[in-house]
């Protein structure tokens, strides 16, 4: 899969090969997104290049209306798109120039230049200045358009907003129902205080490689971890480690991996969230902390997931 980062649309070169494009921001890549992208990939099998044309950030984020946290930061989004069979991804930098681009200019200077013959998008897809561009406008320009209608699960619309609420509330089974996978975050293992080793409970300290959305509740979660392409059960704490420190400037993400004893400093890992166990708490001593960690581990071992 080829990735193109476009900071200025004037840099887009006219292409000769015909493309089928999926249009949208696609944060979370839920089942409705997967349907849009999958249909584009399938249509491209008849001699086209399959492409996703998206933004490097959401307009809401650009205008400061939402936080920067994402369900699928760029690295994760690329991984999922490649798994769906996409040939090319175009990330348009959402800057002042793109913000003021008319809908007609979007069609002529992006879709037409990339030789897009067919477009797949959601029912609420909008583009151009003030979001005035609609799928019908693309259709009027001579490009074939297929619009994905609203999809629901249990009577609720499938949307990124709903997914984010699931993550914030720790409702990971519901997240899986809407996406087909458990919520995950990834990054590098870095050295922490190494206090876990002193109580025979070593942890991998994660430094995120993207601006991932985290659950609202600090505490302990049953998780799985992928390290060196192998999957292990794990128990993960998100929070400030109040037993160790009173500082609340930075949240720590620490994972104890079951049946594992390897040095993985500097390795990239991915943590998959399954269930919330308990809230983070301040213990009177390290002995009390150690006893609770043993209980957390036992609970994790006994759960079938």
Each predicted region: which residue ranges?
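Classical nucleotidyltransferase
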Residues: 100-203, 284-288
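Residue-level signal for inorganic ion chemistry
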Residues: 30, 81, 119, 175, ...
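Phosphate/ribose-recognition catalytic cores of enzymes acting on nucleotide-derived substrates
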Residues: 193-305
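Glycine-rich, highly charged phosphate/nucleotide-binding loops
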Residues: 69-77, 99-107
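N-terminal catalytic cores of NTP/NDP-binding nucleotidyl/phosphoryl-transfer enzymes
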Residues: 10-73
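Residues at the starts of beta-strands that form the adenosine-phosphate
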Residues: 49-51, 87-88, 118, 144
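A glycine-rich helix N-cap at a beta->alpha junction
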Residues: 76-90
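Short acidic-hydrophobic, aromatic-tinged amphipathic segments that line or gate anion-handling sites
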Residues: 2-11, 90
């Amino acid at each position: 899969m080829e990735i193109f980062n476009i900071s200025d649309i004037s840099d887009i070169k006219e292409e000769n090969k015909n493309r089928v494009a999926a249009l949208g921001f696609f944060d979370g890549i839920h089942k409705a997104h997967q349907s849009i992208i999958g249909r584009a990939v399938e249509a491209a099998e008849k001699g086209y290049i399959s492409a996703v044309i998206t933004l490097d950030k959401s307009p809401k984020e650009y205008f400061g209306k939402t936080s920067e946290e994402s369900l699928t930061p760029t690295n994760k989004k690329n991984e999922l798109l490649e798994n769906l069979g996409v040939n090319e991804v175009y990330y348009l930098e959402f800057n002042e120039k793109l913000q003021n681009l008319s809908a007609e200019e979007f069609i002529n200077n992006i879709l037409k230049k990339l030789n897009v013959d067919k477009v797949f998008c959601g029912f609420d897809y909008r583009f151009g200045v003030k979001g005035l561009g609609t799928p019908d406008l693309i259709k009027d320009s001579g490009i074939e358009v297929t619009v994905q209608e609203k999809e629901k699960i249990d009577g609720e619309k499938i949307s990124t907003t709903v997914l984010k609420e699931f993550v914030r509330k720790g409702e990971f089974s519901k997240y899986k129902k809407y996406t087909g996978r458990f919520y995950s975050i990834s990054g590098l293992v870095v050295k922490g205080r190494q206090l876990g080793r002193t109580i025979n409970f070593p942890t991998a300290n994660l430094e995120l490689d993207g601006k991932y959305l985290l659950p609202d509740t600090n505490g302990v979660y049953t998780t799985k971890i992928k390290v060196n392409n192998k999957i292990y059960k794990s128990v993960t704490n998100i929070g400030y480690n109040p037993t160790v420190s009173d500082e609340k400037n930075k949240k720590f993400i620490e994972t104890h991996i079951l049946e594992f004893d390897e040095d993985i400093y500097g390795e990239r890992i991915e943590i998959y969230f399954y269930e919330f166990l308990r809230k983070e708490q301040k213990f009177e001593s390290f002995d009390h902390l150690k006893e609770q960690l043993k209980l957390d581990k036992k609970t994790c071992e006994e759960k079938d997931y």
